[in-house]
Amino acid sequence: MKSRLLFLGPPGAGKGTQAARLCNANGMSHLSTGDLLRSEVAAGTALGQEAEAVMNRGELVSDALVLAIVESQLKGLSSGGWLLDGFPRTVPQADALEPLLDELKQPIEAVVLLELDDAVLIERLLARGRDDDNEAVIRNRLEVYREKTSPLISFYRDKGLLVSVEANGSVEEITQRITKVLS
């Protein structure tokens, strides 16, 4: 199974849930930029306060801030594979990530794109009840996602790394689909 992965998909597609399942089953490190940012916010750090204001508007945190967090996490890993969830989200972020991965001799092996309908996404996001999940913010996040991430999908498709997975259905069904495309 491939062990250096990126997960792409709109908010609510199940990236975090599926990443955790895949990592637990295969001894990989799950690097979720959303979780890392939320922990900075909870700790009340300067970076956390900056990130909180941006996230509350449904916008993306700066590339420099997220890349610094990701770099620190990747350099801190002892061994085994990893799964990046929530980064990169834009082509400039992907361009910034590549030299770091080259330096670490850990190139991406596959990019998993989780796809599903907006109605299901909105329903899932409202149901999970996070503070930054209200319908106006969710719709803005979906718009930002499409605007920023569509070119990234093409970027990884052109590199032959992209695999699409239908993210409707039960958690277990989606996990099985992902495992199948990565084997």
From Swiss-Prot:
Keyword annotations of the record: ATP-binding, Cytoplasm, Kinase, Nucleotide biosynthesis, Nucleotide-binding, Transferase
Region (LID): 127-133
Binding site for ATP: 12-17, 128, 169
Region feature (NMP): 32-61
EC annotation from Swiss-Prot or TrEMBL: 2.7.4.3
GO annotation, biological process: AMP salvage
Highest rank taxon of the organism: Bacteria
The keyword Kinase appears for this protein: yes
GO molecular function annotation: adenylate kinase activity; ATP binding
GO cellular component, one term: cytoplasm
Reaction catalyzed: AMP + ATP = 2 ADP
Location relative to the cell: Cytoplasm
Residue numbers binding AMP: 33, 38, 59-61, 86-89, 93, 130, 141
Pathway: Purine metabolism; AMP biosynthesis via salvage pathway; AMP from ADP: step 1/1
Main location: cytoplasm
Pfam family, one: ADK
Extent of the signal sequence: none
Record InterPro entries: Adenylat/UMP-CMP_kin, Adenylat_kinase_CS, P-loop_NTPase
PANTHER family: NUCLEOTIDE KINASE
Similarity field: Belongs to the adenylate kinase family.
Domain remark from Swiss-Prot or TrEMBL: Consists of three domains, a large central CORE domain and two small peripheral domains, NMPbind and LID, which undergo movements during catalysis. The LID domain closes over the site of phosphoryl transfer upon ATP binding. Assembling and dissambling the active center during each catalytic cycle provides an effective means to prevent ATP hydrolysis.
Assembly mode: Monomer.
Function: Catalyzes the reversible transfer of the terminal phosphate group between ATP and AMP. Plays an important role in cellular energy homeostasis and in adenine nucleotide metabolism.
Name of this chain's protein: Adenylate kinase
